[in-house]
């Protein structure tokens, strides 16, 4: 269950569409955009190109939130074995990135992923149910679930766009 009552209400409204791997380049460009005027980003053009290549190979994935046909939020990351490593997210409308994250979490659970690494503890991610774990426990999770020999693949575009109950 999601920890935020207002997000559950938003998810049930269904005034949005969620897609997987539909427009990865647009998501990474949006994530790379500075959050404030004159701001900088770690997602340089070279980093973007590398992730786009990893997407084409089936390792990097995006989750996109659309409203009225417009991309308004999303996130991207890497899947290795049954572990997903979130890299960055963006939102152009209230709750748009949270909608993408909630659908990602449900998709990963439905596909037996065991690890969703958000990389940093933030108030935003904690509000979505994220929690920090000790380094040793994280290493054990990776040993058990980040199998390097799994076959990468594109995710089904409509794989996360199911009604929220």
What do the predicted segments below correspond to?
Residues 1-165:
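N-acyltransferase acceptor-side catalytic subdomain
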């Amino acid at each position: 269950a999601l920890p935020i009552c207002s997000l559950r209400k938003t998810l049930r409204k269904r005034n949005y569409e969620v897609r997987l791997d539909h427009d990865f380049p647009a998501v990474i460009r949006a994530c790379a955009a500075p959050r404030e005027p004159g701001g900088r980003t770690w997602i340089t053009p070279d980093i973007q190109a590398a992730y786009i290549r990893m997407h084409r190979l089936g390792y990097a994935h995006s989750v996109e939130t659309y409203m009225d046909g417009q991309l308004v939020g999303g996130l991207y990351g890497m899947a290795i074995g049954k572990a997903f490593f979130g890299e960055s997210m963006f939102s152009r409308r209230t709750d748009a990135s949270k909608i993408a994250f909630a659908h990602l979490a449900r998709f990963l659970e439905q596909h037996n992923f065991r690890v969703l690494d958000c990389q940093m503890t933030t108030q935003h991610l904690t509000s979505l149910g994220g929690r920090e774990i000790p380094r040793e426990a994280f290493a054990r999770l990776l040993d058990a679930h980040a199998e390097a020999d799994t076959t990468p693949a594109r995710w089904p575009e409509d794989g996360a766009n199911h009604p929220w109950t």
